[in-house]
Amino acid sequence: MLTFRKIVDFYIHSSIHVGVAVFCLVQLSVPQWTSYSFLVFFGTVVGYNFLKYSEWFFTHQFFRIQYIGILVVTLISALGFSLLFLQQDATVQLNLILAFGLVVLYPFVRKIGWLKPFYVSFVVSYITLFVPLKSDVDVIVLFVQRFLLLSSVMIPFEILDSSKDAVAMKTLPHCFGIARTKQIGYGLVGLF
């Protein structure tokens, strides 16, 4: 049981679950198993780990034994992302560079707490829907639907994290209260 717990902890801390979730969203848009789906998986793991562990990446603390597995997963994902990125056509590469710019802006957007879930939903929708289906006529409708779905799914996590987040962050629960934040989530689901 202890081994299973260690595996689950590693799976969660290395952000593989986030990569799998975003991979699945790409598969909803483009059902065939394309290199783009795996590119997004690897890119998500790298980007999420970089944002999550950025303060440790630049210190000697990160090279402690408990972080080595996460570092290895991140480096393998970076290699996979790089190789698959080079296989994409120029339009996809340009769109991914734009998405990378949006990810780099995330730490600044995070300071505007109430905007964070909507920003993340926009970036994930852009990567999982707009880039692979940019020429599809229904892409705008699908994009709005995915944005509403992702925003509503993030609301419970915003509420859960509200006890840990500083009030100065002004997250949705801090700005509107938990009951009103739930109503916002219900409204987003209704619009979806």
Name each model-derived stretch.
Residues 120-163:
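Functional transmembrane core segments of multi-pass inner-membrane proteins
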Residues 25, 29, 47-54, 102-105, ...:
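Alpha-helical membrane-inserting segments
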Residues 4-15, 60-70, 87-90, 110-117, ...:
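Short, amphipathic, aromatic/basic-enriched membrane-interface segments that mark the entry/exit
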Residues 30-50, 97-101, 138-156:
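Membrane-embedded alpha-helical segments that form the functional core of polytopic membrane enzymes
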Residues 40, 44-75, 151-189:
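Solvent-exposed interhelical
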Residues 20-40, 80-94, 128-144, 192:
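Helix-coil boundary and interhelical linker segments in multi-pass alpha-helical membrane proteins
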Residues 63-135:
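Intramembrane alpha-helical segments
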